[in-house]
């Protein structure tokens, strides 16, 4: 606390990111990073751009990247916004579209940064409870609000809505922006980008951090009709005209263009997810049906926090989230097949030792 802080800063409860440990000899399954590394073409593009041009400012419009992203789904660059990670894109969207006086609606179990943005921008909000089986009930998002935010697939549950349910959300709130946060969409869920031209109130946010394995580069993006994109640009240019540096722009552009690498990487993660899910179920764990690069799991007879601690003692880090509806669960990133087998073996030992 400080007497120099503004009243707003005193009230803030900042987001707490997943641990980034200094140790290297561990299995890190807590922050949903890719186990396979970025596209070789992206790395080569970054190396090629590491030259004297770094003395110059980057393109403030990131036009080449926006063209590449739009071309992938048949849209022009005027339908695309980019930012310094999807967190920045989300923050700009909250500021641009949700200050209408009425509460913003998002699930009670979801990405915890949403609540932080509401505190930062003094936005009223209402947590809409997930069902008992951790599903989003679309009908609960009717009625007066300043907008709707739904992660699809949801985090930390990994459960995804189908496109028909996304349509229902959009039609329930035709005069408010419906933001679909698709950070994990490439791992088997249906993207809402096909609905962009049909619904002027749809904003779809994605990232390079998960399926494209560029979390360290910090590149996020959004698709929406030009009036929404213009709103985001107005916020960006009132905050930071150059959010993406030169290396980020060329690396991300090359990653977009390497479709073959993306498909191969995603398929490996999805195959490992199946093996991990089945392995956990054989050990007695409940596992939610995931369309993400992680699984959300609990054991009916074991304390989740204690399991996380015991795994850490074995140099395996997973994510345990405190909270009334999350305390019994662990979120486990899908690693390589070897990492998943090591995790399952460790859990098998823990469960056996605890039963003695």
Swiss-Prot record:
The record's annotation in Pfam families points to: Aminotran_1_2
Q: What does the record give as EC number?
A: 2.6.1.9
Q: In which pathway does it act?
A: Amino-acid biosynthesis; L-histidine biosynthesis; L-histidine from 5-phospho-alpha-D-ribose 1-diphosphate: step 7/9
Gene Ontology annotations of biological process type: L-histidine biosynthetic process
Q: Which residues carry this modification: N6-(pyridoxal phosphate)lysine?
A: 210
Q: Which UniProt keywords apply?
A: Amino-acid biosynthesis, Aminotransferase, Histidine biosynthesis, Pyridoxal phosphate, Transferase
Q: Which cofactor does it need?
A: pyridoxal 5'-phosphate
Q: Which InterPro entries match?
A: Aminotrans_II_pyridoxalP_BS, Aminotransferase_I/II_large, HisP_aminotrans, HistidinolP_aminotransfase, PyrdxlP-dep_Trfase, PyrdxlP-dep_Trfase_major, PyrdxlP-dep_Trfase_small
Does the record bear Magnesium in its keywords?
Answer: no
Gene3D superfamilies named in the record: Aspartate Aminotransferase, domain 1, Type I PLP-dependent aspartate aminotransferase-like (Major domain)
Reaction catalysis annotation:
L-histidinol phosphate + 2-oxoglutarate = 3-(imidazol-4-yl)-2-oxopropyl phosphate + L-glutamate
Q: Does the keyword Isomerase apply?
A: no
MF terms per GO, please? histidinol-phosphate transaminase activity; pyridoxal phosphate binding
Q: Oligomeric state and partners?
A: Homodimer.
Q: Which PANTHER family match?
A: HISTIDINOL-PHOSPHATE AMINOTRANSFERASE, HISTIDINOL-PHOSPHATE AMINOTRANSFERASE 2
| Protein family according to the UniProt entry | Belongs to the class-II pyridoxal-phosphate-dependent aminotransferase family. Histidinol-phosphate aminotransferase subfamily.
Q: What is this protein called?
A: Histidinol-phosphate aminotransferase
Organism for this UniProt entry: Acetobacter pasteurianus
Gene name of this polypeptide: hisC
């Amino acid at each position: 606390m400080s007497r120099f802080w503004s009243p707003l800063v005193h009230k803030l409860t900042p987001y707490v990111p997943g641990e980034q440990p200094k140790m290297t000899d561990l299995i890190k399954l807590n922050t949903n990073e890719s186990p396979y590394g970025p596209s070789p073409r992206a790395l080569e593009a970054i190396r090629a751009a590491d030259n004297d041009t770094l003395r110059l400012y980057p393109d403030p419009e990131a036009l080449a990247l926006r063209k590449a992203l739009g071309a992938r789904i048949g849209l022009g660059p005027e339908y695309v916004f980019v930012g310094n990670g999807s967190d920045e894109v989300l923050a700009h969207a909250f500021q641009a579209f949700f200050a209408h006086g009425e509460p913003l609606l998002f699930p009670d179990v979801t990405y915890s940064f949403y609540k932080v943005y509401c505190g930062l921008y003094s936005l009223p909000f209402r947590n809409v409870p997930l069902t008992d089986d951790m599903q989003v009930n679309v009908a609960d998002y009717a009625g007066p609000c300043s907008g709707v935010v739904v992660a699809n697939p949801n985090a930390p549950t990994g459960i995804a809505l189908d496109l028909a349910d996304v349509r229902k959300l959009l039609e329930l709130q035709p005069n408010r922006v419906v933001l679909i946060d698709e950070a994990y969409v490439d791992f088997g869920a249906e993207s809402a980008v096909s609905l962009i031209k049909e619904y002027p109130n749809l904003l779809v946010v994605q990232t390079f951090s998960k399926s494209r394995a560029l979390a360290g580069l910090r590149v996020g993006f959004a698709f929406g009709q030009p009036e929404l994109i213009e709103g985001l640009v107005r916020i960006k240019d009132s905050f930071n005209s150059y959010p993406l540096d030169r290396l980020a722009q060329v690396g991300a552009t090359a990653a977009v263009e390497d479709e073959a690498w993306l498909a191969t990487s995603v398929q490996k993660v999805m195959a490992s997810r199946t093996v991990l899910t089945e392995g956990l179920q054989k050990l007695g764990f409940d596992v939610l049906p995931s369309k993400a690069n992680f699984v959300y799991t609990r054991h009916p007879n074991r304390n989740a926090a204690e399991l996380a601690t015991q795994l850490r003692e074995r140099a395996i880090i997973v994510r345990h989230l405190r909270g009334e509806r999350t305390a019994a669960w662990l979120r486990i990133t899908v690693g390589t097949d070897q990492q998943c087998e090591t995790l399952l073996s460790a859990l098998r030992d823990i469960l056996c030792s605890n039963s003695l």
